[in-house]
Amino acid sequence: DSTNY
């Protein structure tokens, strides 16, 4: 999983 802000 990836979370980009």
Curated annotation (Swiss-Prot):
Coiled-coil ranges per UniProt: none
The keyword Glycosyltransferase belongs to this UniProt entry's keyword annotation: yes
Which EC number applies?
Answer: 2.4.1.5
- Keyword entries, A-Z: Glycosyltransferase, Transferase
Q: What is the main EC category here?
A: transferase
Query: Which reaction equation describes what this protein catalyses?
Result: [(1->6)-alpha-D-glucosyl](n) + sucrose = [(1->6)-alpha-D-glucosyl](n+1) + D-fructose
- GO MF, any single term: dextransucrase activity
Q: What else is known?
A: The dextran produced by Leuconostoc mesenteroides CMG713 has a molecular mass of about 2000 kDa and contains exclusively alpha-(1->6) glycosidic linkages in the main chain.
Q: Which family does it belong to?
A: Belongs to the glycosyl hydrolase 70 family.
Function, please? Involved in the production of dextran, an extracellular glucan polymer.
Q: Tell me what this protein is called.
A: Dextransucrase 2
Q: Organism, per UniProt?
A: Leuconostoc mesenteroides
Provide the organism lineage as a comma list: Bacteria, Bacillati, Bacillota, Bacilli, Lactobacillales
